[in-house]
Design a protein with these regions (language model features):
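N-terminal secretory signal peptides that target proteins for export/translocation
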Residues: 1-22
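Bacterial N-terminal signal peptides
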Residues: 26-39
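N-terminal carbohydrate-binding accessory modules
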Residues: 43-107, 126
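Extracellular glycoside hydrolase catalytic/binding regions
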Residues: 51, 85, 89, 168, ...
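A mature extracytoplasmic/lumenal domain signature
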Residues: 73, 112-114, 154-156, 199, ...
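Aromatic-lined substrate-binding rim segments of carbohydrate-active enzymes
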Residues: 89-158, 220, 231-234, 311-323
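Short acidic-hydrophobic catalytic motif
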Residues: 165
Length: 368
C-alpha cells in the first residue's frame, strides 16, 4: 500500500496499491548474495518465550498453542531512507511500542527497502547499509521485548542500478535474493520473526509469480520459489509469507502454484481493502477459506479509505471465525482516509483506527 506519508519520490500520492520498472545476470546475483551474507555481523537473538511456527494450517507458539498474528503495519522504513528523511520515519522507542501494545497489538509488519538494507544504488550511508540494518534490528528487538511478533516485508525494490523508490510488479532477480539472504541471515536465530517475501505482486501470471520471468519492462522478476530458496539456504526456518496476485488480493490459484518449502513453513498472504475486488464475505468464502483449510492465512494489510470501520469490522468478524490473522494498515499519523490508524504517535486512533482498537480490546488481547 502506498499512502500520503510514503509516496514514491517524484510521484503524486495514490491510495490504491502501487507498483509499476535490464536484468544484470546471474553473476551479479551471485556476487550480491555473497556480499549480503557477509554484510550482516551477528544475528538478532531470539526473545525468550516468543516464537511462532506453522503447524498444518495453523500458526502456533513455542508451547504448540494456536496463535493468530493480530496487529498493524508500521510504514516508514520502506521510503524514508530513499527520500533522505531518516530510516524509520517516526519513533521506535519503548514508549511508542507501548502505545501499540495498549491496543492489544501482538504483531507488527515492518515494510523494508532492499536498496537501503543492502546499501546499494546510491542510498546515502547515513540512511542505508550498516546503519539501516542496525536500526531495523534494534526496532525488532524493542518490539520482541514487548511481546510483539514482527513480520519483515520486502516492500520497495527496483532492478539493476535503479533506486528503489516504489513497488514493482514483482521482486527483482537482481537484488531480491540477496536481500532475503541477508535478512534471513540476520534473523535466523529469532523465532519471533516472520518473512513476507514480496508485498503486492500484480500484473504477472501465476507461473511468473512462482518461477520468475522476464517482465515487459525488460528485467527479470524473481519468483516466490527463488525467494523461499534464498531464505532457506541461510538455515533460517521461520515462516515465510507468499502474498497472492492482484496486489495480494487474489488467492484464487495460490494452492495450485504455491512454492515448495522444505521447512514446511509456508503461509499465504492476503491484502484486503474496501476498494479491491475481493472485498465481500462471498469472495472470502470462495477464495480465501479454501486456502485457510490447507495453510495459515495472514491478511498482512487490512484497511478502508472512508474514515470508517464498517468494512474492516466485517472482515475481522469473518476472519475470527475462519482462523485468519490480520494487521491493519497503517500505524502512522495521517488522515484516516490514507488509511491511517492513528492521528498521533501516542496511539490516539482515527475514526477508522477506532474499529481495530475496539475489536482487539473486545477480544481481551494482552495489554488491554
Amino acid at each position: 500500500m502506498t499512502s500520503p506519508f510514503n509516496r514514491p519520490a517524484g510521484r503524486a500520492a495514490v491510495l490504491a496499491p502501487e507498483g509499476w520498472r535490464a536484468a544484470a545476470g546471474w553473476c551479479a546475483v551471485v556476487l550480491l548474495l555473497t556480499l549480503a551474507l557477509t554484510a550482516v555481523t551477528g544475528c538478532s537473538p531470539p526473545s525468550p518465550g516468543l516464537a511462532v511456527r506453522v503447524d498444518g494450517n495453523r500458526l502456533v507458539n513455542a508451547q504448540g498453542e494456536q496463535v493468530r498474528l493480530l496487529g498493524a503495519d508500521r510504514s516508514g522504513a520502506e521510503y524514508a531512507c530513499v527520500q533522505r528523511l531518516g530510516i524509520l520515519a517516526g519513533p521506535a522507542d519503548r514508549r511508542s511500542v507501548a502505545a501499540m501494545t495498549s491496543w492489544g497489538i501482538d504483531s507488527v509488519r515492518l515494510p523494508l527497502n532492499e536498496d537501503c538494507w543492502l546499501g546499494i544504488n546510491g542510498v546515502p550511508a547515513r540512511f542505508g547499509g550498516a546503519r539501516y540494518r542496525a536500526a531495523i534490528r534494534a526496532y525488532v528487538t524493542e518490539l520482541n521485548s514487548a511481546g510483539v511478533y514482527v513480520i519483515l516485508d520486502l516492500h520497495w525494490n527496483a532492478p539493476g542500478r535503479l533506486l528503489a523508490t516504489g513497488q514493482q510488479p514483482m521482486a527483482d532477480l537482481d537484488h531480491a535474493p540477496a536481500f532475503w539472504a541477508s535478512v534471513a541471515s540476520a534473523f535466523r536465530a529469532n523465532p519471533a520473526v516472520v518473512f513476507d517475501l514480496y508485498n503486492e505482486p500484480h500484473g504477472i501470471s501465476w507461473q511468473c509469480w512462482r518461477n520468475g520471468c522476464v517482465l515487459p519492462q525488460g528485467w527479470n522478476a524473481a519468483g516466490m520459489q527463488t525467494l523461499v530458496n534464498a531464505v532457506r539456504a541461510t538455515g533460517a526456518r521461520q515462516p515465510v509469507i507468499a502474498s497472492g496476485l492482484g496486489s495480494g488480493n487474489d488467492l484464487s490459484s495460490w494452492l495450485r502454484y504455491k512454492p515448495y518449502d522444505a521447512a514446511g513453513q509456508l503461509v499465504a498472504g492476503f491484502h484486503v481493502y474496501n476498494f479491491l475486488p475481493c472485498a465481500s464475505v462471498a469472495c472470502w468464502d470462495q477464495a480465501v477459506a479454501p486456502v485457510a483449510r490447507h495453510v495459515p492465512v495472514v491478511a498482512t494489510e487490512l484497511g478502508e479509505v472512508r474514515c470508517a470501520d464498517a468494512f474492516i469490522d466485517t472482515f475481522m468478524n469473518w476472519a475470527d471465525q475462519a482462523g485468519v490473522s490480520y494487521l491493519g494498515w497503517a500505524w502512522n499519523p495521517a488522515g484516516c482516509g490514507a488509511p491511517s490508524l492513528i492521528s498521533s504517535w501516542d496511539g490516539r486512533p482515527t475514526a477508522y483506527g477506532m474499529g481495530l482498537r475496539a475489536h482487539l480490546m473486545a477480544m481481551g488481547r494482552p495489554g488491554t
